[in-house]
Amino acid sequence: MPELPEVEVCRLGISPHVIAQEVSEVIIRNKRLRWPIPDEVCSAVGLPVLKVERRAKYLLLRFSTGTLLLHLGMSGTIRVIEQDTPVAKHDHFDLVFKHGKSLRLNDPRRFGAVLWLANDEDELGLLAKLGPEPLSDDFAEGYLFSKAKNRKVPIKTFLMNNHVVVGVGNIYANEALFQAGILPTAKAKDIDEHRMNSLTAIIKKVLSAAIAQGGTTLKDFTQADGRPGYFAQSLMVYGRAGEACVTCKTKLQEIRQSNRSSVFCPSCQQD
């Protein structure tokens, strides 16, 4: 599943190709995504993109009369292509521009989304309850510790709660907890403030490194120009169950938490 770094890489990749460019056509091949694609997305026709933003794992293309929201779901990719590029299986949506290029959404599992937000109320209804961005100043020392008080849930589950902080998905939660030396099963409320502050800094470092390396390509994700991301080569625990720990050579273990894979080193990580 594309996580925050992959969506940010996508934002950085598409922005130079679409900002200030006028939409000439909207092509919908399959409306049946996570939510049906509304006809209102055609409101973008004739308008230039003012800017491209990201909130959590949502891409937001800003226009003068509204916002086109895109979500990659479990398996989606968005690519910048020439308009005459042949249509492939699972190519559900094109945003066509006058300058000859298109944004194309490919989504085999159809858990992605394409929506039109006509006003601030629409946006608030979808995004208002999200936690802070992990790379923002709002995600600072003391924040995680204050949020974790009396929370008996495992720390990994806590980190992946979008109401606590957005965008720390399974891959990067595994990696951050390993680097912080914290077991994914440790209760959030039992982690002291010093370790929580260290974890905060490590989350920022891991996510920033992933963005710099173009994200993590495991199966579905590619960058906006079709190239893979290279952070997979830097993964220390995710996807390495049964292999030797990069630090102490202990065999990495794997468990299931909330139907997700958690990989950890029983020697380097503590409650």
UniProtKB/Swiss-Prot annotation:
Zinc finger map (FPG-type): 236-270
Against Gene3D superfamilies, the record matches this protein to: 1.10.8.50, MutM-like, N-terminal
Q: Which UniProt keywords apply?
A: DNA damage, DNA repair, DNA-binding, Glycosidase, Hydrolase, Lyase, Metal-binding, Multifunctional enzyme, Zinc, Zinc-finger
* MF annotations from Gene Ontology: 8-oxo-7,8-dihydroguanine DNA N-glycosylase activity; class I DNA-(apurinic or apyrimidinic site) endonuclease activity; damaged DNA binding; zinc ion binding
Task: State the superkingdom.
Answer: Bacteria
What PROSITE patterns does this protein map onto? FPG_CAT, ZF_FPG_1, ZF_FPG_2
Q: One Pfam family of this protein, by short name?
A: zf-FPG_IleRS
Spell out the catalytic residues. Answer: P2, E3, K57, R260
Residues binding DNA are: H90, R109, R151
Gene Ontology biological process: base-excision repair
Q: What is its EC number?
A: 3.2.2.23, 4.2.99.18
Cofactor(s) it depends on:
Zn(2+)
The note on cofactor binding and number reads: Binds 1 zinc ion per subunit.
Q: Which InterPro entries match?
A: DNA_glyclase/AP_lyase_DNA-bd, DNA_glyclase_Znf_dom_DNA_BS, Formamido-pyr_DNA_Glyclase, FPG_cat, MutM-like_N-ter, Ribosomal_uS13-like_H2TH, Znf_DNA_glyclase/AP_lyase, Znf_FPG/IleRS
Recorded catalytic activity of this chain's protein: Hydrolysis of DNA containing ring-opened 7-methylguanine residues, releasing 2,6-diamino-4-hydroxy-5-(N-methyl)formamidopyrimidine; 2'-deoxyribonucleotide-(2'-deoxyribose 5'-phosphate)-2'-deoxyribonucleotide-DNA = a 3'-end 2'-deoxyribonucleotide-(2,3-dehydro-2,3-deoxyribose 5'-phosphate)-DNA + a 5'-end 5'-phospho-2'-deoxyribonucleoside-DNA + H(+)
How this chain assembles, per its entry, is: Monomer.
The record's comment on protein family reads: Belongs to the FPG family.
Q: Which HAMAP family match?
A: Fapy_DNA_glycosyl
In terms of PANTHER family, this protein maps to: FORMAMIDOPYRIMIDINE-DNA GLYCOSYLASE
Its recorded name reads Formamidopyrimidine-DNA glycosylase
**Organism whose genome encodes this protein:** Colwellia psychrerythraea (strain 34H / ATCC BAA-681)
Please name the taxonomic classification of the source.
Answer: Bacteria, Pseudomonadati, Pseudomonadota, Gammaproteobacteria, Alteromonadales
